[in-house]
């Protein structure tokens, strides 16, 4: 039996933790609502492939001194405090990527990973989850 933490819609283990993505059935598939367009599954797959939230370990806007060790640890995603809903003003920080799958915006707003996130996922799959991708 899975014991859900708080109001989580799903969760995934990041490498090198045990494999797995878990989803609440109500948020799997095209179920309607703010989080019912399968973007939660894409978000959790991002975690499974080594990504963190765009707002990971960040409590303010600004510049990271070491983008490989701070925030989401991907240099082409700017620091953010995290977004909810579909912010029409571009988010809490001036350069927020409110459309990023690794934020908490509504599914209708999410539509992309950055190039750096894509490279991190590919690297993670090759090194930490080699059985998932075959040449």
What are these regions (language model features)?
Residues 1-42, 48-135:
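Extracellular (secreted or membrane-anchored) zinc-dependent metallopeptidases
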């Amino acid at each position: 039996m899975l014991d859900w933490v708080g109001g989580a819609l799903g969760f995934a283990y990041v490498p090198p933790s045990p494999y797995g993505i878990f989803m609440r059935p109500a948020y799997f598939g095209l179920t309607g609502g703010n989080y019912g367009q399968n973007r939660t599954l894409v978000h959790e797959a991002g975690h499974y492939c080594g990504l963190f939230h765009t707002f990971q370990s960040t409590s303010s806007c600004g510049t990271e001194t070491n983008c490989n060790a701070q925030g989401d640890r991907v240099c082409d995603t700017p620091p953010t405090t995290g977004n909810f809903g579909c912010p029409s003003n571009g988010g809490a920080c001036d350069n927020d990527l409110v459309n990023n799958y690794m934020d908490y915006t509504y599914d209708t707003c999410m539509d992309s990973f950055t190039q750096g996130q894509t490279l991190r996922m590919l690297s993670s799959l090759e090194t930490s989850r080699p059985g998932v991708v075959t040449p």
